[in-house]
A protein has these predicted regions:
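Transmembrane alpha-helix boundary signature
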Residues: 44-47, 68-83, 108, 128-138
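Cysteine-cluster motifs in flexible loop/terminal segments that predominantly coordinate metals
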Residues: 617-632
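Membrane-interfacial loop-to-helix junctions in multi-pass transporters
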Residues: 87-92, 153-166, 193-205, 237-243, ...
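Transmembrane alpha-helix interface/packing and boundary motifs in multi-pass membrane proteins
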Residues: 106, 174-178, 209-218, 250-256, ...
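Hydrophobic mid-bilayer segments of alpha-helices in multi-pass membrane transport proteins
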Residues: 2-5, 24-38, 54-63, 91-100, ...
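Core transmembrane alpha-helical segments of multi-pass membrane transporters/permeases
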Residues: 64, 103, 108, 118-123, ...
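Long, contiguous bundles of hydrophobic transmembrane helices that form the permeation core
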Residues: 282-383, 486-574, 601-602, 606
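Hydrophobic transmembrane alpha-helices that form the pore/transport pathway of multi-pass ion
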Residues: 187-255, 261, 265-268, 274, ...
Length: 643
């Protein structure tokens, strides 16, 4: 813990007070992370908390590499890459760092990403044996090592630089906020807003997981953290195991698309596109809100379909929630304000982290002790380990791609296969990005897609920012997409259900996330790009489309919706987001007529949030959600049967 806290303090000091070149920052960060990583994430699964001789050896070798590269940083920076031969010491330490990166990747992310990196390394070395269009010139081992380790195009390139600066500081912000009690505040806020409505616990999961996910940036971490609370509650309410897990997975996965933080991949997107991070946040707001509106709507309609009315019980009120946790709103407002003023993400994150400590000190209930701050620093370092390992590996891939030109070759192949057709190109881009993201962290999936797929999209005319945001969305969605669906696997352990069943329910709940990228490339006004009237009409149309999609998917309002009407709603949803004004208005009107007609027939749909509990009874999990039993003493509610 103390070693991690010390490292975190160095990162803060280096980013805020020391101006240094990117090579030195990358060298010190990578070597420091690896030194800790091999001691924390052990090679032995039998005794992970007891480092072996191998672990200590790798840790010391990481430190030695860091010392050598730091002492020789100026020599490395001054040498002419690919022309001046590497010295024996450079060959040794460069090779050692390459092997250490592969092992660090294996320990933090598993064999999936490690196999990808090894495959690209083999391609760099032996790709000259392949026929056109994928063959390249002969590359010796020293040539490959020179590019990957001794320049800022490989290991010490953009991904690791981003992690070493503002990603680390934003993770610190989230960790401090959680340590001070911000996580409880957000959960209580979600409970106060939706706890007494139909399907309340599931709606609490949607809101709280979204709020937590924007800070963590990891769907799996979010599922484990919030799902351990929300999934059992949803089960007791009457949701099936698979649906409860699916709700948590869909809500947690979307957190990486929710401003203002959006996880680490969004920072990398800003670096690759050259677009200020505040602009990335600005254009991502409407799609993220629509995503959660879609999940929220399906959760409510499922509660209607299953007749899962609210259960009586203690739910925090808004007044109590804000009275005890109002100070946690301050850091969020600080982050947003500083970003909008124009400060860099690094300074924004640092100021935000400091504001958490200051805001928490405003109440004796939330005031942080020195030891809690030290714990938060140490936990930040631990949480950054898998991200750093993945981004270091991604740096090796990017270096190899730039060296061999594979990125442009892949773009040529995509365009050739699609024939330059925009729709087919987008479908190929979506499928490739999801495949690249299966079992991999979102940053790695996005980076690979940005290098391999984005050039094809921009070459046929799609705008740069929208193209990269398209790829980011599908990199995020890969976390819940079968057959791997790492977030669903995490939920399966909590829900005690087949991860494939959870994943399929999560995909249905997250359907807006799969469709939204196509929509904002078709109609950029949904990204708040364009005139105010265009944006307003598009937002209204998108809200109507998402509502129609939720009804069509669940087939429910207060009663079953006939198939023909569901088809009509799907068609209306497509038309409502069209960039042409008259067509969009026609789509909105058709949705309003279909849903309004159904609501007029079934007016009870708007009255369905009464608590299902009589004055003397409680809901019985044995008799079913419609039954009201009258025991002498309120019993403990047994777990509901599977539906």
């Amino acid at each position: 813990m103390m070693a991690g806290a010390t490292f975190a303090l160095w990162v803060i000091y280096g980013n805020i007070f020391v101006i240094s070149d990117t090579l030195v920052i990358g060298i010190l960060f990578v070597s420091g992370i690896f030194t800790l990583l091999f001691l924390v994430v052990g090679a032995s699964t039998e005794a992970p908390d007891n480092p072996t001789v191998i672990d200590w050896t790798l840790s010391l070798l990481s430190a030695a590499c860091g010392i050598y590269f730091f002492l020789k940083a100026q020599v490395i920076a001054d040498r002419i890459s690919l022309l001046e031969p590497l010295t024996p010491l450079q060959l040794f330490f460069g090779s050692a760092l390459l092997v250490l990166t592969l092992e660090a990747t294996r320990r933090t992310t598993g064999m999936g990403l490690t196999a990808v990196v090894v495959a690209f390394l083999l391609y760099n070395l032996f790709g000259y044996l392949l026929p056109a269009p994928f063959g390249h010139g002969v590359s010796s081992y020293t040539y490959v090592l020179d590019v990957l380790v001794f320049t800022t195009d490989g290991l010490f390139g953009v991904p690791i630089q981003v992690v070493a600066s503002y990603v680390f500081l934003f993770v610190l912000f989230g960790t401090l906020l959680a340590k001070a009690g911000g996580g409880d505040f957000f959960f209580n806020l979600a409970s106060a807003l939706t706890g007494k409505t139909r399907g309340g616990p599931a709606k609490v999961a949607v809101i709280s997981s979204g709020l937590y996910g924007t800070m963590s940036g990891s769907a799996t971490s979010d599922v484990v953290t919030t799902g351990s609370i929300t999934i059992p509650i949803m089960r007791r309410l009457g949701y099936t195991r698979r649906f409860a897990g699916g709700v948590e997975v869909a809500a947690s996965t979307g957190g990486s698309s929710m401003p203002p933080i959006m996880g680490s991949a969004a920072f990398i997107l800003a670096e690759y596109t050259g677009v200020p991070y505040r602009e990335v946040v600005y254009v991502a707001i409407i799609p993220a809100l629509l995503y959660y509106f879609g999940v929220f709507g399906q959760v409510h309609l499922r509660a209607v379909r299953e007749d899962l009315r609210p259960v009586s019980g203690s739910v925090p009120t808004l007044g109590t929630t804000f009275r005890l946790g109002w100070m946690f709103v301050i850091p969020i407002l600080v982050i947003i304000s500083v970003l909008m003023i124009g400060y860099s993400p690094t300074y924004t994150a640092a100021i935000g982290a400091a504001s958490v400590v200051v805001a928490a000190a405003l109440s004796t209930l939330t005031r942080m002790s020195l030891w809690q701050i030290v714990e938060a620093l140490g936990e930040t370092t631990l949480r950054i380990l898998p991200v750093a390992g993945a981004c270091a590996a991604a740096g090796l891939v990017i270096g190899g791609l730039s060296m061999t030109g594979l990125g442009m070759k892949a773009a040529n192949v995509i365009i050739a296969v699609s024939g330059g057709d925009p729709i087919l190109t987008l479908l190929l881009a979506a499928v490739i990005t999801i495949i690249l993201g299966l079992g991999m962290p979102t940053p790695s999936a996005y980076i690979l897609a940005a290098v391999l797929v984005a050039p094809a999209m921009t070459r046929i005319g799609f705008p740069l920012l929208e193209s990269h945001l398209f790829l980011l969305y599908f990199a995020i969605m890969s976390a819940l997409t079968p057959p791997i669906a790492v977030a669903a696997m995490a939920a399966a352990a909590i829900a005690e259900e087949d991860p494939f069943k959870i994943a399929f329910d999560a995909v249905r709940l997250a359907i807006v996330g799969f469709l939204m990228p196509f929509v904002f490339l078709w109609n950029p006004a949904i990204l708040a790009i364009g005139s105010v009237p265009e944006i307003i009409l598009t937002v209204v149309g998108a809200v109507a489309a998402v509502a129609a999609l939720a009804v069509a998917v669940e087939g429910m309002l207060e009663r079953q919706v006939p198939r023909l009407e569901r088809v009509g709603l799907l068609v209306g949803a497509i038309v409502a987001v069209a960039p042409q004004t008259l067509i969009a208005v026609a789509g909105i009107a058709s949705i309003a007529i279909l849903i309004g007609r159904r609501l007029y027939r079934d007016p009870s749909v708007v009255k369905g949030d009464e608590t299902q509990s009589g004055s003397d009874g409680v809901e019985c999990g044995v008799c079913g959600p419609r039954a009201i039993c009258e025991p002498a003493d309120p019993p403990e509610v047994p777990e509901a049967k599977e539906r």
